[in-house]
Amino acid sequence: MVKRGRFALCLAVLLGACSFSSIPNGTYRATYQDFDENGWKDFLEVTFDGGKMVQVVYDYQHKEGRFKSQDADYHRVMYASSGIGPEKAFRELADALLEKGNPEMVDVVTGATVSSQSFRRLGRALLQSARRGEKEAIISR
């Protein structure tokens, strides 16, 4: 039984890694249609080249234009309450997606649960739209 489980896991990983071959080279983006109640809108950008993910960027942009990963005040508040800042949390999520190739396999970052869940949701939307050849996915909250 354990061998079957390992085989299924290996097969899923291999199939997941190969599934990007149908996605044309380029950068794809997923974001929300509206800003949240605090004026932030998160986005995910993934660049594919040769059937592989080569770059992942995840962040939030405020309606005034600033980015959460670079907002010192937000960093101070988030770090004080959760022990991690947005720049580190977002980098961990992006690196995990590059490594695993599947947003569903990206673990929740401790202290950034809401962002982790949103990251997965944006990741699913981005991959679905990219497979249809669409460069941008805009989803509702």
Swiss-Prot record:
It is a lipid-anchor. Keywords: Cell membrane, Lipoprotein, Membrane, Palmitate, Signal. Pfam families: FMN_bind (PF04205). The keyword Oxidoreductase does not apply. A lipid is attached at residue 18 (N-palmitoyl cysteine). It is found in: Cell membrane. InterPro entries: FMN-bd, Major_M_immunogen_Tpp15_prd. A lipid is attached at residue 18 (S-diacylglycerol cysteine). The keyword Protein biosynthesis does not apply. GO terms for molecular function: FMN binding. Residues 1-17 form the signal peptide. Gene3D superfamilies: 3.90.1010.20. GO terms for cellular component: plasma membrane. This is 15 kDa lipoprotein. The lineage of its organism: Bacteria, Pseudomonadati, Spirochaetota, Spirochaetia, Spirochaetales.
